[in-house]
Design a protein with these regions (language model features):
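Charged, cofactor-coupling segments
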Residues: 3-117
């Protein structure tokens, strides 16, 4: 993840062109999206850090951008159970990590934004 120069600075990236091995401590962007050809697109962007996994010799990602997804843009009828579960799990993590640092008003907003789908 870049600063000032380019949003996608190397050395590492998750792409077909990526030829640099990931190492613990590297920060990347996770950008799943959908694009309707010739019309519109939507993308969710979170920053992730590479961390050692509990299983020796493996790596995993930890999301470090903690912001709820805008529920107004989610059509639950288009999601399968695993996708709903992922969003609910993500929102629980966002709430648990952020709410201790917020004012009562902000905490109330976050609780509503992070409620299960």
């Amino acid at each position: 993840v870049g600063h000032v120069l380019s949003v996608h600075e190397g050395p590492a990236s998750i792409s077909k062109r990526g030829d640099v091995a990931l190492e613990a401590g590297m920060v990347l962007s996770n950008e799943p999206g959908y694009y309707q050809t010739g019309d519109w697109g939507i993308r969710i962007e979170n920053l992730i850090v590479v961390t050692p996994a509990k299983q020796t010799g493996f790596l995993e990602f930890e999301t470090i951008t903690l912001c709820p997804l805008d529920r107004r843009l989610i059509d639950k009828t288009l999601l399968v159970a695993d996708e709903i579960g992922w969003i609910d799990h993500y929102h629980r993590a966002v709430y648990e990590q952020l709410h201790p640092h917020l004012s009562p008003i902000a905490k109330s907003w976050l609780e509503a934004a992070c409620r299960p789908l």
